[in-house]
Design a protein with these regions (language model features):
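Short, well-ordered alpha-helical segments in soluble proteins
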Residues: 3, 21, 25, 29, ...
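Anion-binding (especially nucleotide phosphate/pyrophosphate-binding) glycine-rich loop
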Residues: 3-21
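Short Gly/Pro-enriched turn/cap motifs at secondary-structure boundaries
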Residues: 33-34, 107
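Gly/Ser/Thr-rich beta-alpha loop segments that engage phosphate groups in nucleotides
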Residues: 16-25, 32, 116, 152
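N-terminal glycine-rich flavin-associated loop
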Residues: 3-8, 35-54
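Conserved small/polar residues in nucleotide/adenosyl-binding loops
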Residues: 1-4, 175-182
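Active-site glycine-rich loop that binds ribose-phosphate moieties when present
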Residues: 24-31, 38-41, 54-66
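Phosphate/pyrophosphate- and phosphate-bearing ligand-binding catalytic cores of soluble enzymes
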Residues: 46-165, 172-173, 177
């Protein structure tokens, strides 16, 4: 943990987000007013022809849950981040605060890939899913979380196919719902 060895601050928002550095860059992971785009300076990736490429942050087209890597097919192998020196206790306090918020709102008692659905601008995916009556909706072993509808959890030995089918069904149901909300 960079906090323990170097007292570096800037990635506290990512504490508790499941995944890898490459995945975080790929989707511009973020939570609680922090995003990868705020701290990354560059990333290395491998192209389809096997060449290694370095991309500077300003060329990554980072936006809400999006990056250039979603279109170019490159595999991210590492990232360079701009972090600042901080006080250990302040960093620890922020991480504890954010994890407390996660525990109170997110279904951490079940395996999941974290927040599953991309939020429409100005709205919350979990609220839209709840409004469509999909809390607890299940496909195979995958379920829309009862605790937070923005999460798909592995309730009972879900397969990848269960999770993908559930995500697709929820998306289709949201777009065909007679809800008065703009889609």
């Amino acid at each position: 943990c960079i906090r323990d060895r170097h007292n570096l601050t800037g990635l506290e928002f990512a504490y508790g987000i499941p995944g890898t550095v490459g995945g975080a860059i790929y989707m511009n992971a973020g939570a609680y007013d922090g995003e990868i785009k705020n701290v990354i300076t560059s990333a290395n990736s491998v192209r389809a022809d096997g060449t290694v490429h370095t991309t500077e942050a300003n060329k990554m087209a980072l936006s809400y849950r999006s990056s250039c890597y979603q279109k170019n097919g490159e595999v991210i192998t590492s990232g360079v981040f701009r972090l600042e020196a901080g006080a250990y206790d302040d960093i620890q306090d922020k991480m504890v605060e954010l994890m407390g918020r996660r525990r109170s709102k997110q279904p951490l008692e079940y395996p999941s890939a974290g927040s599953t659905f991309k939020r429409p601008e100005g709205q919350f995916a979990g609220k839209l899913i709840e409004d469509c009556g999909l809390r607890g909706y299940t496909v195979g072993g995958a379920q829309v979380s009862e605790k937070h509808c923005g999460f798909v959890i592995n309730k009972d030995q879900a397969t990848a196919s269960d999770v993908m089918n559930l995500m697709n069904q929820v998306s289709c149901l949201l777009y065909t719902s007679p809800s008065p909300r703009d889609r």
